[in-house]
Swiss-Prot record:
EC number from the UniProt entry: 1.1.5.4
Gene name of the record: mqo
Source species, domain of life: Bacteria
Pfam families from the UniProt entry: Mqo
Needed cofactors: FAD
Catalytic activity: (S)-malate + a quinone = a quinol + oxaloacetate
Name of the protein described by the UniProt record: Probable malate:quinone oxidoreductase
Length: 642
């Protein structure tokens, strides 16, 4: 069956078949007198199989989107490619709206030309057209003539980014400013940006800078080790500077949509925890990266700072808190979307609903095989550089690439759940991110905290996370993910960790069997008067903890941080692990640039320093610079005191 659409402002026709289509918004008038099937605006053509796809006029003269696959005058159109109608003419020429290397244009000698239009980014090849490309071709969008050979279609790009989350968004933003002529393509298996780990409901939204997170300051032999806390804080200062620069450049136009001031508080109860909180405070209070840290262990101050946590509390059990007012709550989903909106405006192509299935070496380049999750069609794209920012799926994709650097690495998935407050009165009584001590054997992502969140301008309150276990590597993943990642080269690492981490195993079993009442008991350590009727259980994101190969007798080490993997040539890289994750994305991506593009760093140095003024320096050794940059980022990011 053939469906013919006729745009009211044109004389040309577009023929499409296959898939399941809607006509565009107000863009189609009655059918011509020839025998055709007419589809009214937004009317579904249910005769076509293949799910709910659409055609949208988009308000532009003669433009249609084929969410196919489909046919344009008998010529196969791959899904998500643009098709155009225009007026009848004997000859016509498609020319790009912006003349730049890599644009494709077609000279057409057809009476009815479905390609021409006011803007041509990828011209649909048409019977009678002569295919040409501009000189200095960097990116060719080749289209097949028939469904039979559609899978052989190969695009080319300078950079392919796997995953439309905060990591790919950050790296893409950096590379666009360092090398604006490089073409970038992003593939995302879901139908929108930042819907997995970067989604605000799938993470704590903490701007991790070790202001309150106790797992960054372990106590050894009665002494607090602050080295990890200082390192995390240094990296978060890089994030603040980079984000402030992006705000000034208009890339992140509204900082209040993604970052808000929320005090960070460390909390302990019982004699041992109180002693630890005090020792930690004494170790950090004079450090230049932790200015303004305060401490209290009296009932009056505790009640003033944390009224919700004071209600119903028996203060005969000692308590202590330390805090810094200038903590942050971050919506990484909103931030990712701002980055990616600017990316599309700058020429980056983002293909949602496309899952990367394989990455293979192709000479000095990489061949990336991608599947359209809606139609099942596959395509390949050849890239000079590939970044795998696919969350938990980074491990199996890097394994498929065959690089030596991933040998021996494994992944241990840990899921999470939150209690979300549904009582607006309670939400308004709490204004802090309060972190306590983790249970013995618990992974850092399971450190309990009572969190004020600001999501889409609305204040919320979460408690958790409660850890769980599933073999999935993504929240929207498969139960076969873990088993698919097993290799002869990483079995020793996995078994070694299994023997060593019995405490973690016991902890996860305990967490998995908890019912709602048991979860409420954990909450009541923070909020004694908590009632089950005021809270609901929601599922958080999935994290894959890194298992790193080490020598005998351990064979494997369970890592709770973020690990960057890259090959020796610097042509492919990926990010493994969990916390601190998104908080240090800019620092992680600068490390990637140094590893993979070392020869360009001298050329890029000035631009990187413009984006991150402290680049190459340790702010812990530069207190005056830290103070200056702190004030700059506070003002630019609109972080008034909480």
């Amino acid at each position: 069956m053939i469906v013919v659409f006729r745009h009211e402002s044109t004389i040309g026709h577009v023929f499409l078949t296959g898939g399941d289509y809607h006509s565009g918004a107000g863009g189609f008038s009655r059918a011509p007198s020839t025998a055709v099937t007419y589809v009214a605006p937004w009317l579904r053509t249910s005769q076509f199989p293949g799910g709910d796809r659409g055609l949208s006029g988009g308000g532009q003269r003669g433009r249609l989107w084929a969410y196919g696959p489909g046919y344009v005058e008998g010529i196969y159109v791959p899904p998500y490619q643009q098709a155009y109608t225009t007026e009848l003419r004997t000859t016509c020429t498609c020319t790009p709206s912006r003349s730049r290397p890599g644009q494709v244009f077609t000279t057409c000698r057809s009476a009815i030309h479905p390609c021409a239009g006011p803007r041509v980014d990828s011209c649909v090849q048409h019977a009678g057209c002569v295919r040409q490309t501009t000189r200095g071709d960097k990116r060719k969008l080749n289209m097949s003539d028939s469904p039979k050979n559609a899978q052989k279609v190969t695009d080319e790009a300078d950079v392919v980014l796997v995953g439309a989350g905060i990591m790919s968004a950050t790296l893409g933003a950096m590379l666009r400013q360092l090398e604006p002529s490089w073409s970038q393509v992003i593939f995302e298996r879901l139908d929108g940006a930042a819907q997995e780990s970067s989604s605000p409901w799938n993470n704590a939204g903490t701007g991790h800078s070790a202001l309150c997170e106790l797992n960054y300051t372990p106590e050894k032999n009665g002494k607090i080790d602050i080295s990890k806390a200082v390192n995390i804080n240094e990296k978060f200062q890089v994030s603040r500077q980079f984000w402030a620069h992006q705000v000034e450049e208009g890339i992140l136009p509204d900082p209040k949509e993604f970052i808000n001031a929320v005090p960070h508080v460390s909390f302990g109860h019982g004699a041992d925890q109180v002693a630890y909180i005090k020792n930690r405070y004494n170790a950090l209070k004079d450090h230049p990266l932790f200015p303004g840290m305060q401490y209290a262990d009296d009932e009056e101050t505790f009640t003033e700072k944390l009224p919700l946590m004071a209600q119903g509390r028996d203060f005969s059990d000692p308590v202590a808190i330390s805090w810094i007012q200038e903590g942050t709550d971050i919506n990484y989903g909103s931030q990712s979307k701002q980055f990616l909106k600017a990316a599309e405006a700058g020429g980056t192509e983002i293909r949602y609903g496309h899952e990367v299935k394989d990455i293979t070496k192709d000479g000095a380049k990489w061949k990336v095989t991608v599947k359209n999750v809606h139609t099942g069609d596959t395509q390949t794209i050849r890239a000079n550089f590939v970044f795998v920012g696919a969350g938990g799926m980074a491990l199996p994709l890097l394994q498929k690439s065959g690089i030596a650097e991933i040998r021996g690495f494994g992944g241990f998935p840990v899921s999470g759940q939150w209690l979300r407050c549904t009582n607006e009165e309670l939400i308004e009584q709490h204004a802090a991110k309060v972190y306590g001590k983790a249970s013995v054997g618990a992974p850092p992502m399971s450190v309990p905290h009572l969190d004020t969140r600001v999501i889409d301008g609305e204040k919320g309150l979460l408690f958790g996370p409660y850890a769980g276990w599933t073999p999935k590597f993504l929240k929207e993943g498969s139960n076969l993910d873990l088993f698919s990642s097993l290799r002869p080269t990483n079995l020793a690492s996995l078994l070694g960790v299994g023997v060593q981490e019995m405490g973690l195993t016991k902890y996860l079993i305990t967490e998995v069997v908890k019912d709602m009442e048991a979860r409420m008991e954990s909450l009541r350590e923070y909020m004694p008067n908590a009632k089950k009727s005021d809270w609901e259980l929601i599922t958080a994101g999935q994290r894959v903890q890194v298992i790193k190969p080490v020598g005998a007798p351990r064979f494997g080490s369970l890592e709770f941080g973020t690990t960057l993997i890259s090959n020796s040539e610097g042509t492919i890289a990926g990010l493994l692990g969990a916390s601190p994750g998104a908080s240090i994305a800019p620092a992680a991506m600068i490390e990637l640039l140094e590893r993979c593009f070392g020869k360009r760093m001298i050329e890029w140095g000035d631009k990187i320093q413009e984006m991150v003024p402290s680049y190459g320096k340790k702010l812990a050794d530069e207190p005056e610079m830290f103070a200056e940059l702190w004030e700059y980022t506070q003002k630019t990011l609109k972080l008034e005191k909480a």
